[in-house]
């Protein structure tokens, strides 16, 4: 169905699955809840929404017997949501670690391995298409923070929202700091 009228989608009994590609919190949240309440499964990669409203949406989906699938919201190319949900049920997790933002990882790697300054590494990441035209969410830690909120909520069976996750960007990291850290045999990385 190609339409710009949301009601046509929600009220069409032929539509079983809705894929949300809007991004942000609103109107995506309202549309997703309306779709679930209308008996439709929903798929999204919207980490902003999942990190802030995921538990509420999951509860609505469960009440309605529908799926709310958001695997692509965290490490899109790596299946992490399903293993956290299903494979680790008998395990007691005490921490989750990993590199969850490719842009910051690339920038820090260039600074560490090539001695680049932050601005130079960011410019190269942008030129190569690794960084968004507005890299704020990546370089200020918001993207990683949202992913941490989603994974922590699942891993620790809790309701962790983005606002509860401490984030610190990499914009203040200097080439000198990276060099000093590297000399001390530690790698600077964007870790959880």
Residue spans for each PLM region:
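Anion (oxyanion) recognition and catalysis
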Residues: 36, 62, 126
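Core active-site phosphate/anionic-ligand binding loop and the adjoining beta-turn-alpha structural block
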Residues: 54, 67-180
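Structural motif
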Residues: 20-22, 45, 52, 71
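Conserved small/polar residues in nucleotide/adenosyl-binding loops
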Residues: 181-188
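Rossmann-fold NAD(P)-binding glycine/threonine-rich loop
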Residues: 47-68
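ADP-ribose/adenylate-binding Rossmann-like module
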Residues: 36-52
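N-terminal glycine-/serine-/threonine-rich beta1-alpha1-beta2 phosphate-ribose binding loop
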Residues: 1-37
């Amino acid at each position: 169905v190609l339409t710009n009228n949301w009601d046509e989608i929600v009220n069409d009994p032929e539509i079983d699955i809705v894929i949300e590609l809007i991004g942000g919190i609103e109107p995506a949240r309202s549309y997703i809840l309306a779709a679930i309440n209308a008996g439709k499964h929903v798929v999204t990669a919207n980490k902003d929404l999942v990190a802030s409203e995921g538990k509420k949406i999951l509860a609505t989906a469960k009440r309605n017997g529908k799926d709310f699938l958001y695997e692509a919201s965290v490490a899109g190319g790596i299946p992490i949501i399903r293993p956290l949900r299903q494979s680790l049920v008998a395990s007691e997790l005490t921490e989750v670690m990993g590199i969850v933002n490719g842009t910051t990882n690339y920038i820090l790697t260039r600074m560490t391995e090539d001695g680049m300054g932050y601005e130079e590494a960011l410019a190269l990441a942008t030129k190569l298409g690794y960084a968004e035209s507005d890299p704020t969410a990546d370089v200020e830690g918001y993207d990683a923070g949202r992913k941490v909120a989603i994974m922590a909520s699942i891993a620790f069976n809790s309701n962790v929202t983005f606002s509860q996750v401490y984030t610190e960007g990499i914009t203040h990291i200097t080439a000198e700091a990276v060099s000093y850290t590297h000399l001390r045999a530690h790698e600077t990385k964007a870790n959880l």
